[in-house]
Amino acid sequence: TQLNDLSSYYNNMGLNTDGEFTEEVKTAKEQMDKEGLKESESMADEIESALKAANVDNQVEITATNKYVMLNMNGGILFNSGEADLTPEAVSLLDSVAGAIYQYNDNYITIEGHTDSNPINTAKFPDNMMLSVHRAHSVYNYLVNNKGFDAKTMTSSGRGENVPIADNTTAEGRAQNRRVEIKIYNNLNSDIQ
């Protein structure tokens, strides 16, 4: 009876007897991924149009995945070196970004801060992780406190130098790695977080 119980358990979980997903589950996941990508691409088009209208599309890189739309903003525009306070240019850019994404305020939104690999050790920021946490939180605070975004559907976190998108051995690569990413999850994935 234990084998029957195990077989029943696997079937209820959408798994075959080898513990692998059944073809039905795989097909459903592929379909959900396609629908998610289609929705994210539509969101990305709307956001990009709004950023173009605000004449800031050259300051934000937009990527659509099957789960979310990611806005990548260069940290050099947002912050002075070694600081987490928003620059006046950052406030202007975030005003435009907020206008472009506010329609998705009910969706789950994450804000991630990233740094290059150059070590920092100040009284305020003992390492890059703390700097990235504070930078992400500065963007979060601005959007929640100044632009009316819902704190219940938005989070901020820092990743330090742990998720580079370019080579940290060059000045250009380090500049690309200093960034803040805003991820707006599509409707299919907003409730899953």
Label for each model-derived stretch:
Residues 1-75:
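Juxtamembrane linker/hinge segments adjacent to a transmembrane helix in small membrane proteins
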Residues 72, 78-96, 100-104, 114-193:
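Periplasmic OmpA-like peptidoglycan-binding domain that tethers envelope proteins to the cell wall
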